[in-house]
Amino acid sequence: VKIKSVKFEKTYYRYFEPFTISLGTHEDQENIEVRLELEDGTVGLGEASTLFVISGETVEIMMQAEKTVQEMIVKEDVESYGKLFSRLQQLRATPAIKAAVEFAIIDAFCKRIGIRPYQFFGGAKDHIETDLTVGIMDLEKTLKKVKKIYEDGFRVIKIKVGKNFKEDVERVVESKKIAPQAMFVVDANQGFTPKEAIEFANILHSERVEVVVYEQPVNRYNIEGLKLVRFNSPYPVAADESVFTKYDALRLIKEEAVDFINIKLMKSGVSDALAIVHLAQSAGVQLMIGCMGESSLGINQSIHFAAGTGAFAYHDLDAHLSLDEKTFRGDFRQEGPHIYL
């Protein structure tokens, strides 16, 4: 069955509260919804979501890719998705669009043959567990938020750091007292020098904070710095912003720079994300999966990918919970940290 049309539409969401990371503060989120229709009327949906400070993409840049995408895939057979994915590799400047279009193709294909996307990816699991993220905020607000997250049943709590060393130490250490059985993902979003990153980790370790992933402590291009932190930190170190493509992943694996890679469909697209899964599994590097500013429609893509591959030790798929959405549009059910397909 041939693809009849593909259209992009801008969508806009407000955050329930301003979301701050070491790279800046966000109060709203503009995404792009991709709607792909087959000649038999079957519709596949995808969503592109990005943060300019991380990927360099803007909504305007992404919208400009619409005509290019139409020329690449309209009038082509949806069953030949491998051929279409190869063409979409040309969208190097807009990986989030590549992800959304690839997923829309998969969504339409799955509806055609009567399966769900997680089954397309392998059907490894039909249930995953996510963490919940605490942005950079003052100590009092941090602890109030951590207490609520912990009481809501989340076993893994992600805390953003990297803006103020002393305050960040206090926020994480005090959070552990509020949530004594919780495991923590600590994400600096490139906010530290290697020396600071090592010192930060050692202080937390001396306070017996259980950090299961220490995410992107240093600048994304500082691979030597990442490696230095990895070999001098008591915690497993993850690359996030350092890995967009399968080639980035291969380089980090060869350099032995990280324990974990954080895959985001919005950085890699579906096809490169699958390649990174296989690379990491071959090399014994662990995986987590994260998100940008997706609504329930966009986070749905990563949930199906994560459950279907069953490849991830930790899931950070919580962006939709921070956005003021009028309508829930995911093909999943969520109870606290538990996501069911």
Q: What does each model-identified segment do?
A:
Residues V1-L45, S49-F52, E325:
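Structured beta-strand/loop patches that form or line metal/cofactor-binding pockets in enzymes
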Residues I3, E37-R112:
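Metal- or metallocofactor-binding catalytic centers and their adjacent structured scaffolds
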Residues K4-Y15, N31, M292-L341:
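Flexible C-terminal active-site loop/helix
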Residues K111-I136:
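N-terminal small/glycine-rich loop or linker at the start of catalytic domains
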Residues I115, V134-L143, K148, F165, ...:
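Active-site beta->alpha loop and helix N-cap motifs at the rims of alpha/beta catalytic domains
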Residues H127-K141, V161-G162, T193-P194, A238:
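Active-site mouth loops of central-metabolism enzymes
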Residues I159-M292, S296-G298, E325-Q334:
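Catalytic core of soluble alpha/beta enzymes
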